From Swiss-Prot:
Residues 8-70 form the LCN-type CS-alpha/beta domain. Negative results: does not affect the cardiac Nav1.5/SCN5A, the peripheral nerve channel Nav1.7/SCN9A, and the voltage-dependent potassium channel Kv1.5/KCNA5. This is Toxin Td11. It comes from Tityus discrepans. GO terms for cellular component: extracellular region. SUPFAM superfamilies: Scorpion toxin-like. The keyword Disulfide bond applies.
Length: 73
């Protein structure tokens, strides 16, 4: 019997609710950050924000519908 594990992909989110920026960061920054949250891999999308693959469902990612970036806390 196989066990299905759901994983998610998405933009990492900083404590301010914004996408985690990768502009002017070292080349492995996003892969390192994705690994830190137990994602399989990640990259700097258009040199602007970290996008990660296969993260645990518990990791909060940026979503347009719940965006609070720049809106205060």
């Amino acid at each position: 019997i196989g066990v299905a594990v759901e994983c998610k992909d998405g933009y990492l989110m900083g404590s301010d609710g914004c996408k985690l920026d990768c502009l002017m960061k070292k080349g492995t920054y996003c892969a390192d950050e994705c690994s830190r949250v137990k994602g399989k891999d990640g990259y700097c999308y258009l040199w602007l924000a970290c996008y990660c693959y296969n993260m645990p469902d518990s990791v909060k990612v940026w979503e347009r519908a719940t965006n609070r970036c720049g809106k205060g806390k």
